[in-house]
Amino acid sequence: MRTKILHIKGKVTAGLGEGRIFLSIPYYIESFKKYLGFEPYAGTLNIVIYDRISLENRLILDLAKGIIIPEHKEPNRVLGSVKAFPSSINSISPAAIVIPARTTHPKSVIEIISPYYLREKLSLKDGDEVEIEVYL
């Protein structure tokens, strides 16, 4: 089976810190280890897409199968499902684009997880351009 690769370019942007909260929840930590093969750093790297081709590729992800982290019910809350796509960012892997079922981000903003603190590993600051390869 051949892997299809989508390319998405964008610029690093600051988030609200919500990724850190969700990636500290044991259910998500264990699920990402199980389904993606790595324990994610407790935070996401947010990327804003600014070109047409990258945005079209991002929209393809809405229709693509991806890896589904199922919804999880706890006594006081429901943890929403997440669709994930194995990826690399500036040739660093493992990484994954994560698309939560419930998000406040527009389609032009994507979230990346990795076992690494990507801002440090790639020496990134807000406004820096990155290239993501998404493996379908």
Swiss-Prot record:
Pfam families: CTP-dep_RFKase (PF01982)
Residues holding CDP: 15-20, 116-119
Enzyme class: transferase
Any one Gene Ontology molecular-function term assigned to this protein's record: magnesium ion binding
Record-listed E.C. numbers: 2.7.1.161
Catalysis: reaction(s): riboflavin + CTP = CDP + FMN + H(+)
Pathway: Cofactor biosynthesis; FMN biosynthesis; FMN from riboflavin (CTP route): step 1/1
Source organism, top-level taxon: Archaea
Sites where the protein binds FMN: 103, 111
Keywords: Flavoprotein, FMN, Kinase, Magnesium, Metal-binding, Nucleotide-binding, Transferase
Binding site residues for Mg(2+): 44, 46
Entry note: cofactor: Binds 1 Mg(2+) ion per subunit.
GO biological process terms, semicolon-separated: FMN biosynthetic process; riboflavin biosynthetic process
Cofactor: Mg(2+)
Record's function text: Catalyzes the CTP-dependent phosphorylation of riboflavin (vitamin B2) to form flavin mononucleotide (FMN).
Family to which this protein belongs: Belongs to the archaeal riboflavin kinase family.
Name this polypeptide is given: Riboflavin kinase
Organism, as annotated: Sulfurisphaera tokodaii (strain DSM 16993 / JCM 10545 / NBRC 100140 / 7) (Sulfolobus tokodaii)
Classification of source organism: Archaea, Thermoproteota, Thermoprotei, Sulfolobales, Sulfolobaceae
